[in-house]
């Protein structure tokens, strides 16, 4: 009882005098809910941990939680209407004893239950996280290690990948130099007879990789890795390099070269010789010849070449122009540097095709021809010379027959060079020799398994053969390697249109990031739109915006619409304008090839100086897209 003159407020008074939250507290509803949730949590963890032991399906735990969630409101209602009394469970309305001591004792018991259930749940959680998960991870790692070991057992012993040499110079901008040395080492090692050498594009995927040597070796399909670092300071260079076994990371050979910078070419040659000796492989000659080095031995020219090559690969108009300027500086230092004349020719072609139109494009092509002629005069027997000549003939002169002859010569001179293989496969593809092209692309992938453009080219060859499922698989593999690589979603649009899948065509067209191919892909997707007004509008809009510069792609849209008269009219325009796309797609394009039995197709091939394709479509395919 309170003191005289004061009012005692009791929270245990009659129910009608309490608010809803006080009533929930009085009836221990909060505590009952906490016990229920804790028990469900603990039991669900227990079921999840024991289910694999009894080979129970995965849905057991999920449905247990769902059932408990459904039962939760009933439990709350039960705890509201019933209470525990000295005589047992009773309806709240039937209990008139108001034994406050027992009521408080019940609350304390529920508190202990809550603590116990939560503690048990936490123990299960810790067990699952730190014990079972660790064991599962160990088991998974053991499985992965077994799989990797099995894959490495299949690769040839005489195989190597050159990982990008780490740049340890104070200036991070010197990375182009360490990358250049890595790339030149790859080029040098391709001259070793009987040695499988992984191309730069795939090897460089593992820059700063945390993967183990075994994982890298399995991914690239090689038994050995070359890794190391480059430190340049002033006029001195230190190159530390080692050859290791992929299977266990043990060293086969290692050495550190600390030399004047002017001796960098000799260092590269020594490394190649040492690797060949360590693997017991004979060289094609007495020593490795570094054919892409400046004939004058000018180190400044070499460094500028590496810098320019790295910048051009950024692929923007500004970077290509900057690279061209650097190449021109190189040629002022060493006018007889044939390799750089070739780089200048290629960069000029790319500048004209990708970024210029009209007279500016033609001037870029003229510059490319002049540079290619210089290269041909200085290094007529270099593989890269014939690759560059073929590229010029294919892209600028629309001469795929002449280009293929050059690519074959380059491949004969450098049979292990992945770039030469890739260009030869492309040359075969451009002339409709798709089976041979597909076979060579697969061989190229074996030497450069992570190079995305090879997969993209392979997909186009498969499209020409109407192998739609395989073309889609290869394209999606390329997307895994480089999701933003140009043209991949356009490939998927073509596949969808050939299948008549309008929804997939529309979805993939919106994902194509290349501005030229993206506009074409969106227009192509509309051509199978049931709304013909939209299809017509898309075609008119594309012709208005792109028809002048992309006549071949306009012809392609008409082919997809099954309008051969307009298709041949635009194909003639493409040939007359020497549209670079004409020679690269005419004999592989599934939409155009649907009309290869039309006499106008044979006449066009004769006019362009290319043979009829050596593959034939099925009757269904030949009837049109």
What is each model feature region?
Residues 387, 402-408, 418-424, 428-625:
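Alpha-helical protein-protein interaction modules
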Residues 70-73, 80-87, 192, 246, ...:
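Phosphate/oxyanion-binding loops and surfaces in catalytic or ligand/nucleic-acid-binding neighborhoods
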Residues 2-135, 250:
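An N-terminal, helix-rich hydrophobic module
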Residues 50-53, 106, 111-492, 496, ...:
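Acidic, proline/glycine-rich low-complexity intrinsically disordered segments
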Residues 2, 6, 141-147, 622-623:
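Long, low-complexity intrinsically disordered segments that are proline/alanine-rich
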Residues 27, 192, 334, 589-592, ...:
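Acidic-histidine catalytic/liganding microenvironments
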Residues 15, 299-307, 367, 518, ...:
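Alpha-helix N-cap/N′ positions at the starts of helices
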